Amino acid sequence: LEAQAHQDVPFEQLVEAFPQAREHGLFQVMFNHQQRDLGALRRLPGLLAEELPWHSREAKFDLQLHSEEDRNGRLTLSFDYADELFEHDTIVAMAQHYVRLLTQVSQQAQLALGDVQLLSAEEQEQQAQWSAAPCAPATLWLPERLDRQARQTPERIALVWEGGSLDFASLHAQANRLAHYLRDKGVGPDIKVAIAAERSPQLLIGLLAILKAGGAYVPLDPDYPMDRLAYMLQDSGVELLLTQSHLLGDLPSAEGVCTVAMDTLHLDSWPVSAPRLNLHGDNLAYVIYTSGSTGQPKGVGNTHAALAERLQWMQDTYALDESDVLMQKAPISFDVSVWECFWPLITGCRLLLAGPGEHRDPQRIAQLINAYSVTTLHFVPPLLQLFIDEPLAQQCSSLRRLFSGGEALPGELRNRVLEQLPGVQLHNRYGPTETAINVTHWQCRISDGLRSPIGRPLAMCCAGCWTANLIR
């Protein structure tokens, strides 16, 4: 109420007092209530007065709600809005919700504001349908699915990199031998094993071996600072670190941690068959450390059940087959690398490994796409922007699917991708590391508007918006 003493300060004076308001606006949303009485105007002698509707074509603010009260107490409400920020249907829905709010509070004066229902019964039902995606739970965990695919297509090429390739049988034989070695070292269900290696066949074999031994892998990016790697080793509680001999000088030593250079092992005497496992869906599959932007990195574990359901949903939805080639280029510290590494190997398609550091080079990515007929790959939006700016990108005719995630996908970038690569599906995906990679998905369209939706929930997930008091 004390602010009422300053209600007559001219707006121009406020702008002078706050220069930043000239560029960003003093405020973005305004509510304006006025009392109106045209009776006196109509009683003027010799003057015929008639009220005409006036609709301004220019919004002074992002959103304005005007309220006019006549002498009988009747209210008339209207919105002005910036059409580059709001679609017409959004404002119509907002108006309906506001009327519903006013109706409820006028009829139930004691109703708590948090209990007001803005949505109609039909909208609530629609929201419930959007928020859940039922699906049969997975029954086979990743090690079993990997082995099943290897038995089905032993001679098919599974892994490709510049200068070499491995078929499914050879890839799994090497991973199985290392897995038996790890079992001999005590690795089993819920035993965490750190791995720090450059993107290479050795990295993938190490990841497969940890999972085949029943353990949970903890990826450490060799490019991380030494003190950060030391913290992750200590915090994770691992007792075994797999790496490559040329990286030994770049990694910290930690008390109680045995470091093994995979490329120095002689494993020919170990069995080529997969170790026998008795995994449960609640056993850990991997632990990925978040970026640590708000403090120390935090290890986030995900289970075999969550991982199996995510990979099963991806295959049911996007249907990779033997004609596909998927490029693995995300750093192993980024959870996108989980599906990049394992989704191709349970579906029989070919996995292409980009070289160390090549994920930062859009020209090199385009060259790899064309050289190996890549059909499927993932970008974070800033790298997608660099890729679509690359002249070679328009020649990437083999592409079928592009996935975007990790940050908001700008509408302008989305439209450029769809226009320049008309034969490509662009999928926007969202999800924190804690939720096993992704929880929502959306196939992008130019008609999506200024913002790219994060979409609807994946199978076995539900999505919604809650207040701080957990009111939906």
Q: Where do the model's predicted regions map?
A:
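Adenylate-forming AMP-binding core of the ANL superfamily, especially NRPS adenylation
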Residues: 65-66, 146-147, 168-172, 176-179, ...
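Small-residue-rich loop/turn and linker elements
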Residues: 10-28, 32, 106-128, 194, ...
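Carrier-protein-dependent adenylate-forming modules in NRPS/ANL systems
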Residues: 7, 72-115, 133-308, 316-319, ...
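Acyl/amide activation-and-transfer machinery of modular secondary-metabolite enzymes
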Residues: 24-34, 59-84, 121-132, 153-156, ...
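His-Asp-centered acyl/peptidyl-transfer active-site segments
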Residues: 1-54, 61, 73, 83-87, ...
